[in-house]
Amino acid sequence: MASTNSTNSLASITGALGLRATTVVAVLTCYIALCRGLRYLRRDQQHLQMPYKIREDFRKMTAEDAWKITKYVQSLEFPWMTKKALSFALFKTYGIPSISKLLCETQQLGKVEYAGRRFADTNILISEFLGYSPTSQRCNSAIARMNYLHSRYQKANKISNDDMLYTLSLFVMEVERWVKLYEWRVLTPMEICAFGTHWKGIGDAMGIDYSSLRHGPESFTDGLEFFEDIKEWAETYEKEYMVPDRYNHQLAEETTRILLANAPDALKPYGQNVVAALMDDRLRKAMMCDNPPPFYINMVKTVFGVRKFVSRWLLPPRPYAFQVRHVTDDPDPKSGRYFMTEYDSEPWYIKPTFSMRYSLLAWLRWAAGKPYPNGVGYSPQGYKVFEVGPKKLEGHGLDECEATRDRLMGSDRGRCPFAFS
């Protein structure tokens, strides 16, 4: 009897909708189930490949495994969102006057003529030590170059350990925060632990002191505890030191210009309100930015909400063949240089290939009178990691960088950074 009733009900639905409509509904339902199933299947498969099933296992997570997990998250699972999160992490550091003042005094971000290259150089170094194994030459060369660029200011007491620790904290936290707010799922505890473990290893290589953290300097149980500790510390630090300052405002203006470089001039005032809507109240106040009209805050929530819905229900996972790479894996066979694969305000280190020179973005930028990858200026020959930085430092610090890289390469950076905590 029950079977007969079900058959009759199905027939009634089919009759009411019509065969064509019923077929469309059935296909759409299957497609949604397939997309959602494939997304969670890949997440679960990634977890099965790693030996970190419970919290007790996290203390054994190696830096090499942590890097593999974070690379998967950033190149396959949430590439667009993690890039925006890392860009915003940098942006957020400009809300601390001790950081913004130094950057304005060096003129590397405070002046239009230098800001584009400074932004590209920073992206290169981050891409190099996030995109390649902690035991690789590329990762350790990037950290060595970054340490060299910082060292001059550290010796002059212009960069404090707290400045470095706060900057590191944002790279640890912002990806998790943005994914939680705007993506189709949150990061799992294992993934959060991986970000904590990976960045703890980078901080060690930078010589950052963790004494200010609850379990610092070296009593952290695992990457998840490190994540929780640095998040707690950063919140307290922001309350005291993220305060209004004209240097903050100057950098906010210049960075917003870079972020909106590809927007038509007529839309830039609206874009500035969108950027302001992405800030929290404390950051907006510190950067002396006007509060955006409520419409923009609601619009941002709506746009990201629609994106989250579409990603969760209507899009299959990104194929492995389409992993996102921000820099080239292989060097140019003649010059040994690498290239960036995308650009923001200026095409620094972009190889002027046919696809780059004649892309839709290039045509739009050409029509607007903006720079595009035509092989003129902006180092189209590519980059070498030890040359990255201000133009006046090209060719400087090579011996120091090589020595630091070799020391890091010999320090077993692939092991668990909490093994001796």
Please place each PLM-identified region on the residue numbering.
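Mature, function-bearing regions of proteins
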Residues: A2-S421
